[in-house]
């Protein structure tokens, strides 16, 4: 991945952010909380799966607030749904009442123009004392089921390596060292090894009860993000056989790296390869100049225990919120979504081991957080 540093320059206009990909990407990368879900590159990743994107921006005094909205239109429904992941975006990461009202007005106007039933938003904001939630409610947003993880761990890569190690749990440090003794090495890879990544990742997802995506989806993701310096693929290999026994696909935006997808084989679990792999990912991202490492969610008991071993600050987000554009359209879209979820649960009804309800075996093997349905 490329160095996240950006040169300072004159501020963009709202019109430029809405219509110019380069201006938007620069604004996003330089913001206090850049997320790949808000990048034009991510919109390109989503396009083959039927998603389209538009952006809105508004000037609030001497500040600008902007957002990228991904749009999906289910077959047979004259309304689409909009998804605003980890936004809106502001230079300082703050979102006050004026900014919320301004972006809400722009989303209403654009939502009607794009014939949306509703827009679901998951701000990159902490729940805190509830102030943001109150302001969103006053602006006619309503709480909704979250799509992305509603809590995560953020590692501060501005610390030196000794401080990062000190912040890890003792058993995690021991597992990292043991993995090295058991004969594990970490290597960077390119897109030619995506089939190996896919085999490990999908096996992990299936064991965790998550519907795997197609290999083409991940290959497209790599092909679109890697040339922009937004993706990095790592493998843990057994030093004696050369076999790939664990993998991670990292995605970056601005100064932040997200630990997005991964998996571990049974042999990788035996050698604790997931511990060494994650530690090396952290070290290499720090060396590349990134300042924040997002472990991307704490969704299940076993996964939470594994991830929290690496330290970091727990962040609890304000959650997901819906803005209704068309009441009829939203009702139809909600009914369709409920039907698809029932089918998904039926299809994967036999995947979970009843004796392992929290996925502890999968977590022990070091699987990455299951991806959200819409954000990837």
Regions found by a protein language model. Give the residues of each.
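Flexible glycine-rich active-site/ligand-binding loops centered on an Asp-His dyad
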Residues: 84
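Residues at the N-termini of beta-strands
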Residues: 81, 116-118, 256, 292
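Short catalytic-loop micro-motif centered on adjacent basic/acidic residues
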Residues: 118-120, 187, 291-295
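Active-site/acyl-donor-binding loops of N-acyltransferases
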Residues: 2-12, 17-21, 31, 44-45, ...
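Short, high-confidence coil segments that cap the C-terminus of an alpha-helix
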Residues: 51-53, 113-116, 231, 288-290
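Aromatic (often tryptophan-rich) hydrophobic motifs at membrane interfaces
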Residues: 101-109, 219-334
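A gly/proline- and charged-residue-enriched helix-loop-helix capping module
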Residues: 88-135
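A conserved beta-strand-loop-helix scaffold within acyl/acetyltransferase catalytic domains
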Residues: 15-61, 65-77, 123-128, 133-150, ...
